[in-house]
Amino acid sequence: AYGLGNGKGKTIEERSRIEQAMKLTGISELAERFPHQLSGGQQQRVALARALAPNPELILLDEPFSALDEHLRQQIRQEMLQALRQSGASAIFVTHDRDEALRYADKIAIIQQGKILQIDTPCSLYWSPNHLETAKFIGESIVLPAHRIDKNLVQCQLGCVPIQSTHSDATSGQILLRPEQFSLVNISQNSTACTVSTFEAIVQNIEFRGRTTSVQIAINHHEIWIEMGYMPDLKIGERIDVYLQGRGMFYN
């Protein structure tokens, strides 16, 4: 454990810390192996154990899974997250994978050109970002020029769209919507708590992708892709009703 020094004369307390770190990361059976005898995933576990051995309050992880294949990355990611939580250490996790950040972080800092744009929980960053750049970076988005016609209503290429409350009094700006806000199912029939707007659309394309189906639609000549968890009974060129659930985000 490099954090405790390379010397052979380790104290009982230091050896106890090493054993605990190895147990946390599931590498106790690898104690006598050399580095070249370890797989990529095992090497990552060893690296985390070395970092945890001194009982640090804070650990920096700089894209630790970038060299692993996707299947192994998911497995090691879960194991490391569990070990970190059990150790009680906080971690700064540097990643360019937004899905990874949204899935595992307690809080996310969005940094652009060395400047922190926003620090917040994943949910708040995704649905209530302070900046348009943050909103576009953190998830798939549809951005359209918009003109405010009421406090919580704008006119855009799609039509009239309700927006979230905003501190801005600007009459012109841009509205941002998430593709998953669009649906072929009117949820307002089962719930009165959600704002739902209806638009007429034309089916442009249908792509079956196994677990999901992507449907490309055109609303007032603006094309949008919708991800669905089933294979819809649709035909290209068909006119359908599309429902926008919730409100858009307005930026000036």
Say what each PLM segment does.
Residues 141, 152-252:
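Non-catalytic connector elements of ABC transporters
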Residues 2, 39-40, 138, 145, ...:
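Short glycine-rich loop/turn motifs that provide flexible caps or phosphate-binding loops at active sites
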Residues 121-151:
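ABC transporter nucleotide-binding domain
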Residues 71, 137, 188-189:
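Residue-level signal for well-ordered alpha-helical positions
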Residues 1-133:
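ABC ATPase nucleotide-binding domains
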